[in-house]
From Swiss-Prot:
Keywords: Cytoplasmic vesicle, Golgi apparatus, Membrane, Protein transport, Repeat, Transport. It comes from the Eukaryota. This is AP-1 complex subunit gamma. One of its GO terms (biological process) is intracellular protein transport. The lineage of its organism: Eukaryota, Amoebozoa, Evosea, Eumycetozoa, Dictyostelia. Residues 775-893 form the GAE domain. Residues 604-626, 639-658, 675-687, 706-731, 746-765 have a biased composition (Low complexity). Residues 591-687, 706-733, 746-770 are annotated as: Disordered. Belongs to the adaptor complexes large subunit family. One of its GO terms (molecular function) is clathrin binding. Adaptor protein complex 1 (AP-1) is a heterotetramer composed of two large adaptins (gamma-type subunit and beta-type subunit), a medium adaptin (mu-type subunit) and a small adaptin (sigma-type subunit). Interacts with rhgA.
């Protein structure tokens, strides 16, 4: 005979170790199984109760499911109560055993004993499946009109479960619901309101059936607010706050986008807002729901101001939860009436000093929404003060928002530059990458403030050179506007003593030298320093030139390849007759607009591009399109190599194109004038060959076929021409040096100059080529399997170079589980060249809650003749299970 439940609990509690507990549970489970086999009716109820306790401890109890079914068919209420409780805990709606309980539940719902009806409805509402909902729905419709309110309220809650499983049955319950609102029992009204809200949220077309109930709901709410003390419903001095909150929530749904229904609610909402006690938490709950209703429906302006004032009072509350919901609600309604929210600006700013990190975060978001042209100076000053004491987790986001509002609402460019410099000096290395580039673009596009900006940056560098983003911007500006720094004194800022600062060339070089030698200086900052020195060599006097050369020469043997390459190229550039034009001041930098698809969570699926576009008339192709794509940074060759005969022909043609490009830039190709120059050019040629080889070895997926890259083109071309004549060799050596120095500089081609017969024979322009009109950017779905969706956002970044295509791969996950260890690789045919960047993440969140992007650039050497075809290699895991696929993803013919 098994022990009692009380004895089992005492035994388990007295166990000293987990092993001892498992042993006791195993013994008791064995005794329970034995009793089940013997069909011991007296101990069945007690055994199921002990199984429930064992289940709560986390041990398996599946063997007791049939015992629960045997208990619910018993005529005894005590047996049914334990049986239904075991049914709810040991089974769920997916268990096939549950189908055996359908007839028993149907019979118990129609029982004359209200307690048996109650436990059966309770079990049905918790474990009802779709099939069971269809079978027992007629009984629920009957008991929802029962005379006993105890049964009616449970039936209304069961109706919610039925409609969630079978929404088609909604029409059957709407007539029954209207009668429930006429009840005097608050529990019945509360469950009826819950059922109405559920129907409206599931199907918005059903709202029209309940709009006629607005006057009735208003009367119920008015009676609750004006009634006296009711002990059975009073909570904290408020009459039935749960029912009031539920009515306000339903009024919010019925009054949305309905002026007539909203007008009927205005008076009662004003009454609730003014009469509810806000000193207790229960009153604040009603006020919060009332504010949400006022801001959602078509309420009067005065009522909205009252609601915002209530939220302002919430900000003064000592409870962090109330302050948080106030800030959260104000962030949502700030666009409705920003002037009313502005009245509480000081209180919102004070929330930045709150010790609770979540409140500080919400206050920061709200202040960002409150910034306008009239208060930009005040709020930015407060945000800068907060930036001084902000935690590291806030700084990056705060800096980004500060720069956005500064750019959007700045009263003038000078104030904008001062503010961003202040932000960068405070935030240090927490500056996002786009902030320095945006500041450089701002200074470059504002010539009248160039002198002022470079002087401010010089002063900032004198104070602190450990902030790398600020140091890099300062070095860029000093390199571009160093002559203004040492010459123009009219706008020079004052120091702390109010005296004008005199900046000499040696002082500028000293601070760059200090940056070189400082321990915190990164390699990227040293690269900026080398470029800045090279720029200053054409802006400073001859007395400073020797020191600049010495500082650059010190890095010609540096172990860092990038620093060594820059130093060698700049050192060679000093002897070049075109140095002044190459190192001249850059033209104003145009601000690049972000792609409209960036940050979109849902990528629209369009029809296949081949059906979307019509065939267009072809036009002659420009000769220099290939060079524009090469200079744009695409250096990686494809995974295949051509034969040696084709390599020689391609090298000759590319050499002719390189000379044509130089003629377009400088008017004519440079020619040697002495043997000394020839020797220097030969040295330069050897240096560039070494650099090109090093660069090729460091690329991703590089092979021996470099005829598609600028480095390989100049290398092979020079080697071929060394055996022919010195003149062409010198010209092409200088061309290679120029292209190495210019790096990613984008060049605009000019009309082609007349060529000699030999040049025309080597030039590809003697072949017939065509140019298609520029296709518009296009987004389309290319892969959809295992919940993984991949969309391509294709665009042509250069209208005069259709051979270059940018493909932004947007990867989303429609499944319910996250995709981990995601890897995407791409292979292309021989006539294509691809540069594939790393993905933004290797984890793709589920349910379309986020996206991963991976950018690729494709260069088509046979544009207009062969399409772009990418074969992807996908590897990922879902719940630890690996998946792999190799799909082909063609692009439209016009791309």
């Amino acid at each position: 005979m098994s022990s009692k439940l009380r004895d089992l609990i005492k035994t388990v509690r007295s166990c000293k170790t987990a092993a001892e507990e498992r042993s006791q549970i195993a013994k008791e489970s064995a005794l329970i199984r034995t009793a089940m086999k013997e069909e011991d009716l007296e101990s069945r109820q007690r055994n199921v109760a002990k199984l429930l306790y064992i289940h709560m401890l986390g041990y398996p109890t599946q063997f007791g499911q049939m015992e629960c079914l045997k208990l619910i068919v018993s005529p005894s209420y005590a047996d049914k109560r334990i049986g239904y409780l075991g049914l709810m805990l040991l089974l769920d709606e997916k268990q096939e055993v549950l189908l055996l309980a359908t007839n028993c539940i149907r019979g118990d719902i129609m029982n004359s004993n209200q307690f048996i009806v109650g436990v059966s409805l309770c079990a049905f509402g918790n474990i009802c499946s779709t099939a069971m909902a269809r079978d027992i729905s007629p009984e629920i419709e009957k008991v929802i009109s029962h005379s006993n309110p105890y049964i009616r309220k449970k039936a209304a809650l069961c109706a919610i479960r039925v409609l969630r499983k079978v929404p088609d049955l909604t029409e059957n319950y709407i007539p029954k619901i209207k009668a429930l609102l006429s009840e005097r029992n608050h529990a019945v009204i509360l469950t009826a309101l819950t059922l109405i809200i559920e129907i409206c949220e599931m199907d918005s077309t059903q709202i029209i059936h309940f709009k006629k109930m607005v006057p009735q709901l208003v009367r119920i709410l008015k009676s609750l607010t004006s009634s006296g003390y009711l002990p059975e419903h009073d909570i904290g001095g408020v009459t039935d706050p749960f029912l009031q909150v539920k009515i306000l929530r339903l009024l919010r749904i019925l009054g949305q986008n309905d002026p007539e229904a909203s007008d009927a609610m205005n008076d009662i909402l004003a009454q609730v807002s003014t009469n509810t006690d806000s000193t207790k938490n229960v009153g604040n709950a009603i006020l919060y729901e009332c504010v949400q209703t006022i801001m959602t429906i078509e309420s009067e302006n005065g009522l909205k101001v009252m609601a915002i004032n209530i939220l302002g009072r919430f900000l003064l509350n000592r409870d962090n939860n109330i302050r948080y919901v106030a800030l959260n609600t104000l962030s949502r309604v700030v666009n409705t009436d920003i002037q009313a929210v502005q009245r509480h600006r000081n209180t919102i700013v004070e929330c930045l000093k709150d010790p609770d990190v979540s409140i500080r975060c919400r206050a920061l978001d709200l202040i960002y929404s409150l910034v306008t042209e009239s208060n930009i100076r005040v709020l930015v000053r407060e945000l800068l003060n907060f930036l001084l004491i902000a935690d590291a987790q806030f700084k990056s986001e705060l800096v980004a928002k500060l720069c956005i509002v500064t750019e959007k609402y700045a009263p003038n460019k000078r104030w904008q530059i001062d503010t961003i410099l202040r932000v960068m000096s405070i935030a240090g290395n927490f500056i996002p990458d786009e902030v320095p580039s945006n500041l450089i673009q701002l200074i470059s596009s504002t010539p009248e403030l160039s002198s002022y900006a470079v002087q401010k940056l010089y002063l900032a560098l004198k104070q602190d050179i450990t902030q790398q983003p600020l140091t890099q911007v300062g070095l860029w500006c000093i390199g571009e506007y160093g002559d203004l720094l040492v010459a123009d004194k009219s706008q020079l800022p004052k120091d702390e003593d109010g005296l004008s600062l005199n900046v000499s060339e040696q002082a500028v070089i000293d601070i760059i030298d200090l940056i070189f030698r400082h321990a915190t200086t990164t390699q990227a900052t040293r690269q900026y320093s080398l470029t800045s020195l090279a720029k200053l060599s054409s802006r400073f006097s001859q007395s400073s030139l020797q020191r600049i050369k010495t500082m650059i020469d010190n890095y010609k043997q540096n172990i860092n390849l990038e620093l060594q390459q820059r130093a060698c190229e700049y050192s060679t550039l000093f002897d070049f007759d075109k140095k002044a034009s190459i190192l001249d001041r850059m033209p104003p930098i145009e601000k690049q607009e972000e792609s409209p698809h960036i940050g979109n969570k849902n990528i629209p699926t369009q029809t296949p591009p081949q059906q979307h576009y019509q065939q267009q008339q072809q036009q002659p192709q420009q000769q220099s399109s290939q060079f524009g794509s090469i200079l744009d940074g695409l250096d990686s060759p494809t995974q295949s190599s051509a034969n040696s005969g084709n390599n020689n022909n391609n090298n000759n043609k590319q050499g002719g194109n390189a000379m044509s490009l130089l003629e377009d830039i400088f008017g004519s190709a440079p020619t040697p004038t002495s043997n000394g120059n020839m020797n220097n050019n030969n040295n330069m040629n050897n240096m560039n060959n070494n650099m090109n080889n090093n660069y090729a070895m460091g690329g991703m997926g590089m092979n021996n076929n470099n005829n598609n890259s600028m480095g390989g083109m100049m290398n092979n071309n020079n080697n071929n021409n060394n055996n022919n004549n010195n003149n062409n060799n010198n010209n092409k050596s200088q061309a290679s040096a120029l292209l190495d120095i210019m790096g990613d500089l984008q060049l605009t081609p000019t009309p082609q100059q007349p060529q000699s017969q030999s040049q025309q024979a080597l030039s590809p322009t003697n072949q017939t080529s065509v140019l298609q009109p520029v296709p518009q950017p296009l987004t389309f779905l290319v892969y959809q399997k295992h919940g993984l969706n991949i969309s391509y956002e294709c665009s042509k970044p250069q209208p005069n170079n259709l051979s270059l295509t940018n493909i932004n791969m947007v990867i989303t996950n429609t499944g319910s589980s996250p995709i981990t260890n995601f890897s995407l690789q791409a292979a292309v045919p021989k006539y294509l060249k691809i540069q594939l960047l790393a993905p933004s993440s290797t984890v793709i969140p589920p349910n379309n809650s986020g996206e991963v992007t991976q950018v690729s650039k494709v260069l088509n050497s046979q544009q207009g003749q062969k399409p772009i075809l990418l074969r992807l290699k996908l590897d990922f895991q879902i719940n630890g299970q690996p998946f792999s696929d190799v799909p082909d993803t063609p692009l439209p013919s016009l791309f």
